[in-house]
């Protein structure tokens, strides 16, 4: 079953509802195995898709109608980031989305469902007004179901793209579990494993799923996919094969998560094909490069700071370190979906506000403010207000 009747409902790989709300009343059904759109139908327009998350919009902006991967090891915040993206996109862009839970924890699937009800993305009183369709094939399902649930989610998204001519963001959490399920099926079929024990058909399987998640001239599919990185090794065949298909990669760093900087996105490791002066604009490009240069220099100085200490640095380097620490903290942001843990209300920061903030930090206009003022705030005005209140507390 596909179409509007799937919105607000949770289905399994066969399209059967698993939310105890009765059958899905849909007259339209699509097969889950469908071919990718022809090359001539693909959309080639380049424009930036604003997420309202500072570090993403600045350092590795997403392409409207592109494919995005969130890479990270265990417990660095992939699911929170993907849930925040669903929340922001549903509110700011107002479209429908499809969320595919591929081999992840049932608890996370349940949490996501409850959060969506709270934030009215799923409307319990009037299900037809919901903004998202959920497709789950969780960890306890057999490998065949986990391997195919991605195709079911793609099929639902394709209906909104091809029939309703809508822009749809499908979210997939987690692509690694799709590969893992494929590896289990491969072993059951008695195939000889290839590198690191993965299936020999890894590239083909990944291609057949990824090639379908694409934008055509009818409507766009901006997909956001979480990719678990086994043992924090980005060269592992699963994340490496995935990144070949993506327009932007958002890499989460354990080091930043340990410092308490959330979202723990590493601007130096994250990449995007959209960060070009002729696409993003000179101003955005120059600001992003300036931020990256400052952070890179700070990274190079870490060894000196760790042993002889800050006093051994030149005056110029000390300034760089101070600004880099402010930038690092300003890249953190309170999330709507994490209000429960952080205790501070979530913030959506527009791209222009983000650029304005970093343009003030880089040349040193805000050198007199303490670095705590930049931690977990929205735009730069909130940082200056926080600095003033910190100052008042001291006095």
From Swiss-Prot:
GO terms for biological process: proton motive force-driven mitochondrial ATP synthesis. InterPro entries: ATP-synt_VA_C, ATP_synth_F1_bsu, ATPase_a/bsu_AS, ATPase_alpha/beta_chains, ATPase_F1/V1/A1_a/bsu_nucl-bd, ATPase_F1/V1_b/a_C, P-loop_NTPase. ATP binds at residues 72-79. Keywords: ATP synthesis, ATP-binding, CF(1), Chloroplast, Hydrogen ion transport, Ion transport, Membrane, Nucleotide-binding, Plastid, Thylakoid, Translocase, Transport. The keyword Protein biosynthesis does not apply. It is found in: Plastid, Chloroplast thylakoid membrane. F-type ATPases have 2 components, CF(1) - the catalytic core - and CF(0) - the membrane proton channel. CF(1) has five subunits: alpha(3), beta(3), gamma(1), delta(1), epsilon(1). CF(0) has four main subunits: a(1), b(1), b'(1) and c(9-12). PANTHER family: ATP SYNTHASE, ATP SYNTHASE SUBUNIT BETA, MITOCHONDRIAL. This is ATP synthase subunit beta, chloroplastic. It comes from Blechnum occidentale.
């Amino acid at each position: 079953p596909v179409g509007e009747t799937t919105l607000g409902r949770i289905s399994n790989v066969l399209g059967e509802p698993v939310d105890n709300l009765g059958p899905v009343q849909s007259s339209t059904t699509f097969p889950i195995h469908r071919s990718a759109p022809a090359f001539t139908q693909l959309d080639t327009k380049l424009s930036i898709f604003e997420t309202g998350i500072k570090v993403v919009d600045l350092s590795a902006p997403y392409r409207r109608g592109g494919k995005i991967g969130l890479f990270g090891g265990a417990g660095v915040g992939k699911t929170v980031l993907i849930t925040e993206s669903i929340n922001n996109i549903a509110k700011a862009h107002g479209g429908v989305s499809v969320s595919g839970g591929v081999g992840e924890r049932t608890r996370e699937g349940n949490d996501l469902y409850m959060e969506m009800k709270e934030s009215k993305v799923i409307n319990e009183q009037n299900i037809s007004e919901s903004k998202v369709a959920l497709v789950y094939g969780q960890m306890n399902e057999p490998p065949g179901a986990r391997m195919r649930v991605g195709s079911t989610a793609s099929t639902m998204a394709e209906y909104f793209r091809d029939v309703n001519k809508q822009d749809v963001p499908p979210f997939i959490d987690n692509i690694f579990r799709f590969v893992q399920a494929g590896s289990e099926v491969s072993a059951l079929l008695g195939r000889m494993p290839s590198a690191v024990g993965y299936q020999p058909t890894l590239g083909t399987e990944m291609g057949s799923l990824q090639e379908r998640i694409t934008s055509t001239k009818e409507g766009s599919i901006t997909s956001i996919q979480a990719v678990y990185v086994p043992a924090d090794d980005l060269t592992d065949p699963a994340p490496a094969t995935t990144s070949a298909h993506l327009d932007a990669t958002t890499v989460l760093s354990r080091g930043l998560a340990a410092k308490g900087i959330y979202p723990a996105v590493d601007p130096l490791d994250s990449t995007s094909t959209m960060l070009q002066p002729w696409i993003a604009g000179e101003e955005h490009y120059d600001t992003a490069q300036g931020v990256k240069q400052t952070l890179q220099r700070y990274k190079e100085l870490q060894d000196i700071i760790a042993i002889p200490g800050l006093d051994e640095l030149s005056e110029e380097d000390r300034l760089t370190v101070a600004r880099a620490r402010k930038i690092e903290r300003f890249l953190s942001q309170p999330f709507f979906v994490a209000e429960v843990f952080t205790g501070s209300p979530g913030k959506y920061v527009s791209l222009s506000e983000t650029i304005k903030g970093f343009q003030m930090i880089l040349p040193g206009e805000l050198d007199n403010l303490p670095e705590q003022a930049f931690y977990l705030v929205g735009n730069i005005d909130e940082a200056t207000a926080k600095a003033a209140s910190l100052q008042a507390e001291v006095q």
